[in-house]
Amino acid sequence: MNNNNKYNKETKIILSGKNNNSKNSFVNSPIYKGSTVIFKTVKEMNASMKNKHMQTLAYGRYGSPSTFEFEKAIAEIEGGYSAVATSSGTAAIVASLLAILKTGDHILLTDSAYGITRNLTKNLLKNMGISTTFYNPNIGIEIQGLIKKNTKAIFLESPGSLTFEIQDVPMLVEIANKNNLVTIIDNTWGTPLFFKPFYHGIDISIQSATKYIVGHSDAMLGVIITNKKYEKCIRESAHNMGSCPGPEDIYLGIRGIKTLSIRLERHQKNALKIIEWLKTRKEIDKILYPAIPENSGYKIWNRDFLGASGLFGVTLKKTKKSLIHQMLNKLQLFNMGYSWGGYESLILPVNPEKYRDTYQWEKEGGTLRIHAGLENADDLINDLKENINILRGI
């Protein structure tokens, strides 16, 4: 890693992952389009294959110089020991789970986890003989009662990307350590800038780099960051699955890192300004965003996080589903889409009840997930203002 500790975070991001030994070079790293690495001697070839999982040029699937730059940059920013890039966030989740779990094992999974993570445990892991217990994301020390003799890991997502519950990560890590359990967290919402998993003792951090890291909705990319203990098994799992990212996606990931700080500042600023306006509206029942004092998770967020991203939710007062759809169809700046983290603002009707096993999600008027993009906040508010009365049949 580079010795950039004397700099502030914005400068560290620009310098992250770079090999600055060369006197003359382009400011941007090249795109390496190649599958085969050639060697001049048998000794070089054998040495390369022996270390193929450890950021060594051996074969295209194991990475290129730009892949290694991306991985080193993310590890530096997030504070992990090492990172491995994957073809998507889902690939990162699968590779992590399969690296840690085997037939007969048991995992504790937060009930606020991403839907695909839930599906993986209910289908892929179940078919492999691995059992899952979902736990309430607001659980405290009571999680000890869910730990079995064959429990191997606790999977966290703080906050969840539909209902935004903040988990007490330090407490859960302490309990996990006492029981020799691996801790895995989905840190996509927190990003490497706003939440530092390894400072809090997490073993493995996963992110859908497709979202804030890439930041422009033009690449699919995932990344797994680890401590030293789990680096080797995570790398081998990801590489053996063949979940390698394409060279253009890696390039776009590196580009995204360089502007991550300034983009997140705008996302957070816009989200907070929109939320302050939404607080004044009689159509809104509750705002789901841990960075506001009214939220039940604010105390933990304020203690553990360094900022908040642009994704939040709102629950509506009782209204007709047809009116919700009518309002969404008329919005001009908020488009409907399943992803988030790009420059564009998005809005999506969601039903968290479909993704709950441990407790019910009872909200009469429906729930909307909103991503505040990089547009002017006043324009975004006006777009909502011009159409929100539809929810009251006006």
Task: List PLM regions with ranges.
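PLP-dependent enzyme catalytic core of the Aspartate aminotransferase-like
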Residues: 122-123, 131-133, 144, 318, ...
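Glycine-rich beta-alpha junction loops
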Residues: 18-20, 33-40, 211, 259, ...
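Conserved small-domain helix->loop->beta segment predominantly found in fold-type I
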Residues: 272-332, 336-341, 352-362, 392
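N-terminal "arm"/small-domain region of PLP-dependent enzymes with the aminotransferase-like
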Residues: 1-64, 72, 368
